[in-house]
Amino acid sequence: MVEGRRRRRFSLSSQQLALLLLLLSFFLCFSVASPRAISDSDLLDETVANSSSSVASLNASSSSSLVKPKEGSFADIIDRALEKEFNESDQNEVADPGSFNNSVAGQQAVLETVARVKSTKKNETKEEKRFQLHDVFNLNNDNRAEDTPTLIDRKDNVFIISNSKSKYPVLQLDLRLISDLVVVIVSATCGGIAFACAGQPVITGYLLAGSIIGPGGLNFISEMVQVETVAQFGVVFLLFALGLEFSTAKLKVVRSVAVLGGLLQILLFMFLCGITVSLCGGKRSEGVFVGAFLSMSSTAVVLKFLMEKNSTNSLHGQVTIGILILQDCAVGLLFALLPVLEGNSGIVHGMLSIGKVVVLLLSFLAVLSILSRTCIPWLLKLMVSLSSQTNELYQLAAVAFCLLVAWCSDKLGLSLELGSFAAGVMISTTDLAEHTLEQIEPIRNLFAALFLASIGMLVNVHFLWTHVDILLASVILVIIIKTTIVTTVVKGFGYNNKTALLVGISLAQIGEFAFVLLSRASNLHLIEGKLYLLLLGTTALSLVTTPLVFKMIPAVVHLGILLKWFSPDSTIEKGEIVRSESGKQRMILMSRQSHSS
């Protein structure tokens, strides 16, 4: 018995000695290093294999030294019962299809060295840091849960572990993501309040708040990819709410300019930019891409502005929305066009890809049209009957339906925006469209603010300030060219000067989706690095200045009246519907009915 106690004490002292040596090695590493943050190159010298083997040996030594309860005691009975219930196969990790070996073998992965970064605690450092404002947003609480590990490869790419393996199922929290979301939402709220008090559009406050806290500003956000992914729900719910307010009767009035005019303005941009670049001695493929890039407008920003001004039901608002929806439908076509412009795939292959997208789009819309007439009314009535006491279930069902249709659209190679808008249009054909809109509005407003703030985070303030001269000139040129082309196209469909000009100004910016299009073209080596930076900065500055352009619309309208471009008594809601013979007949019929009543 005494010998057993001695062995137990010896095992405990050896464990303590191992831990002491481990802490001493960490202390020596930190004492040799400089007091600054550990760089990636310093960390890359350690391999994952060595670190994992040391941790495994430490776990083995600690598990072998566990004190077992006394034989025959109540604790021993419980211990044996637990061992019988939970055997070794349940406790050990089982290799699943996503394990390391299967991933390497099945996906032709390349084994490379990465560094695993963990946050240091206060008692592990010898020197105390000075207080910085950035430390307020760092999670340095000793009582918090374990921070999410970070991996860095040799190219300085940072990866956040999404599913850390554990012997037992435990609740995993990404506290940095929670902190980032809190910072973004609070900053967007403060920015919106400040600009609302100043009488300015709250959109500007959201964008400016995002640029301040983003990597180009104070760099308060750690997980950009995760925050931007969550913020993408803002576009989804914005277009879902737009679809709920959509009217097929109003669409029939503007469908020609929305479909044909939207396609015409995209083709005009591609043709003019391609010809201009060819005349200047550049690559025609780059010019065509720049034209497609410039033709895209910001759906989220424009819709937010129209909703704030209650202009979604106006004629120029309906035309603007129709063209924006057409641009969202053309996203898949533009993606299919990029390999053709790059030159690796032939024209025939490119045409087949575009034809495939068109067939998928038409088939998808046909299936949704059938479902909207058969299943959707019955499903909504069922949700209403089940939500008699509270609207919680109906609200959840509406959100789930929107996300499901958007997900299906994305899986078919179309866009999330198109799917979410189609989901709203499906419900708009029923009697519960207004009720659904009331339930979805709070969620839409929250995620819309989050999305606009995430757009602001893409703006690098230092980069914009360094190249403000050329970027500002590029933005002014984009505004003038887009306003001129869109106004000319809308005017060509029989609309008067005022409506055409308002539509042109509303679409005179580069959309946030252009970031995705630009990154895809860069990966295909379709454009050079200098052009990439120019387009990136122009897009960012264009989104920031868009609310200011919207603020100038009343002044532009007043100037148009002074220059007699359009009559002062023309309205947006009624008088401008007279654009064709059928429109004139409808207006005459309405006036006769009003006189007879």
UniProtKB/Swiss-Prot annotation:
It is a multi-pass membrane protein. Induction: Down-regulated by high K(+). InterPro entries: Cation/H_exchanger_TM, KEA4/5/6-like, Na+/solute_symporter_sf. Residues 1-35 form the signal peptide. The chain crosses the membrane at residues 177-197, 201-221, 224-244, 257-277, 287-307, 321-341, 351-371, 396-416, 440-460, 461-481, 499-519, 543-563. Keywords: Antiport, Golgi apparatus, Ion transport, Membrane, Potassium, Potassium transport, Signal, Transmembrane, Transmembrane helix, Transport. It catalyses: K(+)(in) + H(+)(out) = K(+)(out) + H(+)(in). Disruption phenotype: No visible phenotype. The triple mutant kea4 kea5 kea6 is compromised in cell wall biosynthesis and has small rosettes, short seedlings, and is sensitive to low potassium K(+) availability and to high salinity (e.g. K(+), NaCl and LiCl); it also exhibits a reduced luminal pH in the Golgi, trans-Golgi network, prevacuolar compartment and vacuole. These phenotypes are partially suppressed by the cell wall-derived pectin homogalacturonan trigalacturonic GalA(3) in the dark but not in light conditions. It holds the Pfam family Na_H_Exchanger. Optimum pH is 5.8. One of its GO terms (molecular function) is potassium:proton antiporter activity. One of its GO terms (cellular component) is Golgi membrane. Belongs to the monovalent cation:proton antiporter 2 (CPA2) transporter (TC 2.A.37) family. KEA (TC 2.A.37.1) subfamily. This is K(+) efflux antiporter 6. The gene is KEA6.
